[in-house]
């Protein structure tokens, strides 16, 4: 959760909270790339980032909702070109760390929680899951 404090549910499957320190879109992108070991692209809204919404997968279209809930930026897996343009124009930062990159890191935690919830069912996390894309 990027060290977020005061975390609340966001958009059903995401979270919104306060970062330990104010940062920039680039600083957040660098921290995300290091934490997840992925490539990160960002649209810099040009404002300091303290409150962050996080949603795995494809949630670029949720940036308006994130902004309405007081977030300064949204970190997600996929963001369209036009979502990035609109958010940037509105002074809101969007970061895209890849669909795979934002979902696979939590797969083990989900498997553990499912196993605890359903002890009579054997839960197995796939080890063959891979990002379908190749990167330069």
Regions found by a protein language model. Give the residues of each.
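Hydrophobic structural segments
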Residues: 1-136
């Amino acid at each position: 959760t990027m060290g977020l404090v005061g975390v609340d549910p966001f958009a059903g499957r995401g979270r919104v909270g306060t970062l330990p320190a104010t940062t920039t879109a680039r600083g957040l992108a660098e921290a995300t790339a290091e934490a997840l070991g992925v490539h990160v692209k960002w649209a810099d809204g040009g404002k300091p980032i303290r409150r962050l919404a996080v949603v795995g997968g494809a949630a670029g279209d949720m940036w308006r909702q994130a902004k309405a809930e007081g977030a300064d930026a949204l970190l997600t897996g996929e963001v369209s070109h036009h979502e990035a343009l609109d958010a940037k124009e509105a002074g809101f930062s969007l970061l895209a760390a890849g669909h795979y990159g934002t979902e696979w890191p939590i797969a083990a935690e989900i498997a553990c929680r499912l196993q605890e919830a359903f002890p009579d069912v054997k839960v197995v996390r796939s080890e063959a899951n891979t990002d379908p894309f190749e990167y330069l």
